Each structure stands twice: as C-alpha cells, then as structure tokens.
Amino acid sequence: MESLWNQLDQFTDAPTKQMLQALVKRKQKFENYAAQCRRWRWASLICLGLLCVMIMIKSPEPQLILQEILSHTFYLFWMLATAFAYCTSYYFKKKEEKSETDFHKLRCEIIQKSTDLWPQPDKWKARESVFHMMKHKYDINLYFESK
C-alpha cells in the first residue's frame, strides 16, 4: 500500500496526498463500524430466536410462559445477553452514521476543491488518474458528490 502512495507523488502534492490518505482511513473506519453493527445485529437476532425457542420448548402451557421466564435465572440471563447485543448494535450504528458523515464530508470537500488541488491545464490528467485509482482500489467515488 505504501508503494501505491509513493506513486501518487508524481500526481499530487503532499497536502493532497494527506487528504487522500485521510479519506481512505475514514472509509476503512466507516466499513469497520458497519461490519461491527451487522455482527452485533445478527448476534442479537440469534439470541432472541434461541430465547424464544427455548421458552416454547420448556414451557408446559402457553399460559405459564411468564412464570417459566421469571422462575429460571437462565432465561433472565439470556434476555440480558439479548439486550446487551441489541444495545451494542445500536451503539455501533450511531458510530457508523457519524463516521459515514465524516467520510462523506471529506469526500465532498476533495471533489469541490479538485480544481484547486489539480490546476487546470497541466495536472488535470493527473487528477483523472488519481480519481480512477481511488475508485478502483478503494471504491471511493470522487467523480460525483452523491452517495
């Protein structure tokens, strides 16, 4: 990856290179939070499903489900685990949304300042190659501001 950034020296100056590196870091941070959120959502869904299945299997009658839940601490522990998994997924969802807005703001800033970062006649072709590399290597679209 470092050699890729060294190749950018011929196309960009140092501040632009730092902006692009920060953009890649923010994208990775956003993707990490999104993966964590998905992981905890699945964990909470599995915990809830297993809790429901265990209650339905162990409960002798449908009228006694509440009594069954309150009489065994195992069910209470399982409900706490489900609630913890859900709250953790909610936490990571908020972090994901914040990191997505940070990433999108920096991406839009680079797009808006592209005429300043790459002056028109001499480095405009370099801009195109940098945008192409960012699109194909990191899946970051610098052509348009829309998400």
From Swiss-Prot:
- Highest taxon in the source lineage: Bacteria
Annotated localization: Cell membrane
One Gene Ontology cellular component annotation?
Answer: plasma membrane
Q: Name the InterPro entries on file.
A: Uncharacterised_YpbF_TM
Q: Which UniProt keywords apply?
A: Cell membrane, Membrane, Transmembrane, Transmembrane helix
Q: Which residues cross the membrane?
A: 42-62, 64-84
What protein name applies here?
Answer: Uncharacterized protein YpbF
What would be the name of the gene that encodes this protein?
A: ypbF
